[in-house]
Amino acid sequence: MITQDTPALNPTEEHYLKRELLRCQLDYEIGKLNDQFALRKFGYPFSPNDPTAPQPISNNDSSPVLGGKGHFSVNYPMLSYVLQEFISTFPLLSTNLLVDEKFWQSKVQVFFEHFMSLGFSESYDREEASKRKKVSKKLSKVILLLFNSGVGSFQEQAYYNEDKFVLQSGQARKRSNIEKFAMPTRENLENLLTNESVFINGWDVNIISVFNKNSRKCTESVDNDKSSKSTPTSSPKSHAIKSFASTSKWMKNAFNNTINSTINSMPESSASLFSKLSLGVPSTKSKQSRKHHYFLIKIKKQDDDDQDNSNEENSNLDHHAGYFYVTRTYSDFKKLSHDLKSEFPGKKCPRLPHRNKKVTSMITKTEVLHNGQTKSAAREKIVNTFDTDLQSASESDNSSFLQTTNELSATETVLTEKETETLRKNILNEIKEEDNIDEDEYEEEGEGEESDFDEYKDASDSKINTLVGEKMRTSLRQYLRTLCKDAEVSQSSSIRRFFLSGPNLDIKDINPKIADDIRNRALIDVSNLENQIRFQQMALEKSLKLQDSMKDFKTSLLKDEKYLMSLLVEIKDNTKVEDLSPLLQDFVEWCKIYISSMIYQMFLGNDNSYELYTQIRRLHKLMPYTVMGQIMKFTNPIAIMRGMIELFMAQPFGGHSLLQTMFSTILTDDLKTQKVAIKELERKIAEMDPGASVVTKCLKDFVFNNDTKDEHDTKLFTMDAVNAESESMNMPVPLIVLMKSAAANLIPDEVVAGLIESYSSWKLQKEDTDALNVTSEDQSGIYFTHVKDLWQLYIKEHDKQLMRQLWQDPELTQMLKAIVTMIYEPMVKIFKVARMDVALKNFEKFMSDLIRLVDDVINGQLGVSTQFDVVEEIHNLVTKHQDAFFEFIHDVYLNDSEGIFEGFITWITTIVKFLQKSKFGGPSERIDFNKLICRDDIDIDVKLLKVQVNNVLNKKIGARKIYKKLLDLKVKQGTKQNNKHAAGILQKNWSDINSLVMPSSSGSFGLGDGDLVDLDLDTGDYDFLHKENEVELEKQYKDLLNLVVDESEIDKLRSQVFAQELKNYLEAQIAKK
């Protein structure tokens, strides 16, 4: 009871009481869903009875237990509201099926109860967040966000006026303007790429050069330097030139001035390595000659970064303090991949890129400046790709090279038509001289050798440089950096051996040709970044034009819920982009730039772009567009979809469907692979300890047979008990299982003692990550590592077995069939009259034009004299096809008999209106919590309730302050790092450009920065702040988050009155519609 002497809740206390009540209610509802029969108490549209029972399914409209549509169970008011208001009303779902209770009861409810009965592992069992746990956390954030903004307290407007918590990132967004926005120059990019470290989990890794080396020995002589300046003599041609792809000798003869060396063997020391890089070509060759690609890797550990900010007066190659320089072959990369699979059998590591034989040629034109210095600009030309023949190349009148960099540099010059023609004639002359040159030989694994020839200079002093293995360089660099992103893999012994074993080469002693190769490859990296900056410049121009329009759009959207519908009418009335209003035209231009940038990033700009492009290109060639178009033109899409669904999901004679068989087969194959890894680990463990067989048997029995044991067995202990004890003792789960098994006399104590000793060694090794190789004294640590990995494999094997059983049982297939039908039914009704055959032809034309353009870029089919600009060409390509795409959207909307387009607008407007209730809603749309705690029918200690609310409030305020410090530190460090890293600069630029058009501020929608921070705190989703350098702040923050605040009276208020009050409030909101 509350008396007159009891002070009322102030606006801040009322707001946080509302938050805590909502959070407690949501946690309660999600926790209740862990019950196998939870949906029987959920309410509409589920059944309170056994859904598999033969009796007729109850009609919820007349059920006093469940209520009908628009009514919620007091046990699940929040989740019921989300289901009825946001999920059931989603436009792409068939209305008929959604209102059909049989779908929810006989399909969804039956599957839910079956799934919960199987007993899949939890996140704690895996020592990592399971997919279900991650989805649950994100779902909790979204729902809590909705209701915190959608349910208003009586004094909440006063609270929002008082709460001025703003994060630095939000302030930075407000300061974003054209004056603050700066594009880096070519010189800055080159400096950032070559001099500044980019650490990923403590490693800065870059492959800076690729060079060839003969595996056979050749004679070394003092005359190598002289022979390098003369024309090489080669043996007679051994076999005919077959194709551009298989034989590219003429290209290498013309352009390979970067690394024209053949070396016999890999020396142990860096001095001998680089001193033996011959500048000449052997006078004789044979078919048995073999060459390898050697990748020069530049590596740095983060511990050595302290002295790396000194004066940068030296050249790029002299700036090497703290770096390791090692060489590796593709075989070394294969061994690394194999070692990682052996060291982490339960981890899915990135796939090693396939070999490719592509050669990148680039043109650099040197111009003498007035001060006598020289400057070169890069032109990337890839000349050996796909199916281009030497013969067709020699007959082509347009064979030339592609210019890929922009004209940012004032001193940069472009080859004239005459110079280009001179280059072309010399290239064709080299083709005719091919009879005197031997073809390339490749390893049996497919690795190609590259010959090295003298540098060619045209009349204008333009140099053509061939960069062997450039595509492999970027792909393998991406592979290494992806490996380093995994914290455990980055500190593994396999990675450390790969990076640090062998001699540390002295970069000062490198051959000048290798030095040129390093510079040229850096210029290609700069060129890719420059093209991205060109996209950013275009996006910035469009964003500035669109900025004012978006402000008006945002204001109109908040004031008039029909404003979006009026914009949608333009799509219905017009067939071309040029006929749209200025706002939509600007928006389309902005979208085109992002699409163009995405295309460049996917196919040309990233390290792994080439592999993705070859896959897309191959798929495009195999796609039967004409046949598909004819089918879409003359055949009913509904019948096709129905036939496909019946084909995959039909169960002839009561057997398994094709879909069930497919997934069961895949899971069976996975289980076979899993069993091989398990047996290998069991063998290793058995070799390391005589009692290890008892350990593996105990763990396996606990994972696979614990659920089948007698519940009254005194020796039985559950996974929940193990997890609780593991968390309280801060020890790994498998160790707790073995300790409890030993306590129950299931295994000998000495076996557990040996594992505990191994665990202690493992912890010490984990803390000391500087040891490169594991010595014999550290074998006990490896013993525990294998046991821990074996536990994870057992858990995953158990889950895969359950997943296979789930696919074999009919419940999942029946639900999937109903869901697919529910989704495709409204879509095919639209596409039936949307001229899909025309849309498919237009898509084929777009893809063909795109493939042709990218082919020309890669193959170097576009001349340098044409002032070709890849950035502008991609944008023009998108512009060329924009009307075809817009016409398709127009046709779909015009024939939208299901109202999907307008349904999306209504659905989005409903969400926006709901989010604004707490900040902008009227008195009738609010809950008065002061009246709520004054009710006579509750047993609440209001003074204690206020104390608990203030304790929660103090915890949140303290957490906000530390969170803000951590975030400000992160932003400050991020800004500092972004200014040092080229990729960081580009990412920051995109963020600033985006904020001009679509500000990240959510205050207008009822969401403040403080509320969003509290949301992270409520759900424990603060991974964003992990791994910062400020350890003390992190410790304070985590300690505060782990501080347990007594909320007994708050939860009592929730259970006694708030759940019912929330139910009534939400039902009243629906009744108003």
UniProtKB/Swiss-Prot annotation:
A GO molecular-function annotation: phosphatidylinositol binding
Keywords: Endoplasmic reticulum, Lipid droplet, Membrane, Phosphoprotein
Membrane topology qualifier: Peripheral membrane protein
Entry annotated with the keyword Cell division: no
Gene3D superfamilies registered for this protein in UniProt: Phox-like domain (3.30.1520.10)
Source species of the chain: Saccharomyces cerevisiae (strain ATCC 204508 / S288c) (Baker's yeast)
Stretches with biased composition (Low complexity): 229-238
PX domain mapped to chain residues: 273-506
Protein name: PX domain-containing protein LEC1
Region (Disordered): 218-240, 431-456
